[in-house]
């Protein structure tokens, strides 16, 4: 396929690329009109790190951000039940982000952001702190990540795995990590976002105060830890039904409006104008 045909394909309906041999090691790329290069948002879906939910749930947000002038990289990854868990899930998220320079598309790799919902929020903040690993743990590189993330956005996520393990009696966290923090402290040390603070970029947390799936306490605790350690984390709390767990992936909702407001704001490192 010629470069011109590829770009036309990306503009009209996007394309799916493989970043590894497994069928879950795929991602969809959408690029807005215009010469570019365009800022990039990496989307990471949730679903308790299990195989029952896939990247399709993020397509509404992808479509909205595409219209606002962003290139969108909506990733899939191996999850518990289809070859994922420790360390594969973490390795896949890192590999998907590091695959961006290999794409023949007008992407501005100096302006890459990451956004995740629920379990994807955990993975987004973990990916944002990969530069702190430096050769230790999945997804680490001795010279640092190939792609530098400029800002991280996490929606209703789990940012303290050890605390979630205790709160939920193991559950999804135990399935992801292969056990608890007392028996596997080395895994939690490199897989738990709370242990990797402060991130080197600004973080936006959005969470509903009445979320019955993932308590807002996780966002509050993470924000306190980041800011206390010299980092920058902002928390937007959504009250009432507008802050339910799944409302975050509705592009018409208040939770998503908080994200797009941040992306337009002066504090954001990237603020493209909406595409008419």
Task: Please identify what each model-predicted range represents.
Residues 205-207, 211:
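Short beta-strand/loop motif that positions the catalytic acidic residue
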Residues 220-276:
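C-terminal catalytic histidine-bearing segment of alpha/beta-hydrolase fold enzymes
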Residues 212-221:
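Conserved alpha/beta-hydrolase "acid-adjacent" motif
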Residues 98-167:
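Primarily recognizes the serine-hydrolase "nucleophile elbow" in alpha/beta-hydrolase
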Residues 1-35:
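N-terminal cap/lid segment of alpha/beta-hydrolase-fold proteins
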Residues 33-37, 41-64:
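Short, surface-exposed "cap/lid" segments of acyl-processing enzymes
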């Amino acid at each position: 396929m010629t470069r011109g045909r590829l770009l036309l394909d990306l503009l009209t309906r996007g394309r799916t690329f493989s970043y590894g041999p497994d069928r879950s090691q795929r991602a969809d790329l959408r690029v807005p009109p215009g010469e570019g290069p365009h800022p990039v948002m990496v989307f990471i879906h949730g679903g308790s790190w299990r195989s029952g939910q896939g990247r399709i749930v993020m397509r509404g947000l992808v479509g909205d951000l595409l219209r606002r002038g962003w290139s969108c990289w909506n990733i899939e990854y191996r999850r518990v039940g289809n070859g994922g868990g420790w360390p594969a899930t973490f390795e896949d998220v890192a590999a998907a982000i590091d695959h961006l320079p290999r794409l023949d598309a007008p992407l501005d790799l100096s302006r890459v952001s990451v956004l995740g919902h629920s379990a994807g929020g955990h993975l987004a903040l973990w990916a944002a702190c990969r530069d702190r690993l430096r050769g230790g743990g999945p997804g680490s590189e001795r010279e640092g990540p190939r792609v530098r993330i400029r800002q991280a956005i996490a929606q209703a996520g789990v940012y303290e795995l050890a605390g979630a393990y205790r709160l939920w009696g193991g559950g999804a966290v135990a399935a992801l990590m292969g056990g608890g923090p007392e028996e596997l402290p080395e895994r939690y040390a490199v897989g738990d976002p709370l242990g990797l603070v402060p991130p080197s970029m600004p973080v936006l947390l959005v969470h509903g105060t009445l979320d019955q799936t993932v308590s807002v306490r996780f966002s509050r605790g993470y924000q306190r830890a980041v800011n206390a350690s010299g980092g920058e984390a902002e928390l937007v709390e959504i009250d009432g039904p507008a802050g339910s767990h799944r409302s975050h992936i509705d592009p018409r909702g208040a939770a998503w409006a908080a994200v797009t407001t941040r992306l337009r704001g002066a504090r954001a490192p990237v603020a493209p104008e909406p595409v008419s």
